Amino acid sequence: MSTTNVQYGLTAQTVLFYSDMVRCGFNWSLAMAQLKELYENNKAIALESAE
């Protein structure tokens, strides 16, 4: 039985970009929703490619 370790997530650059946007007045809730969507998309792609 083989085990595949799949890594996924957001880059520090992406998180810092959204942090800067919030500091400049971008809606925090919208920023968090978009980051979550990016994370879920990255997760789906990583898991699909591991199959």
UniProtKB/Swiss-Prot annotation:
Keywords of the record: Early protein, Host-virus interaction
Gene Ontology terms describing biological process: symbiont-mediated suppression of host cell division
Record's function text: Plays a role in the inhibition of host cell division. Interacts with and inhibits the major host cytoskeletal protein in bacterial division FtsZ to confer growth advantage to the phage.
Subunit structure: Interacts with host FtsZ.
Protein name: Gene 0.4 protein
The species this protein was found in: Escherichia phage T7 (Bacteriophage T7)
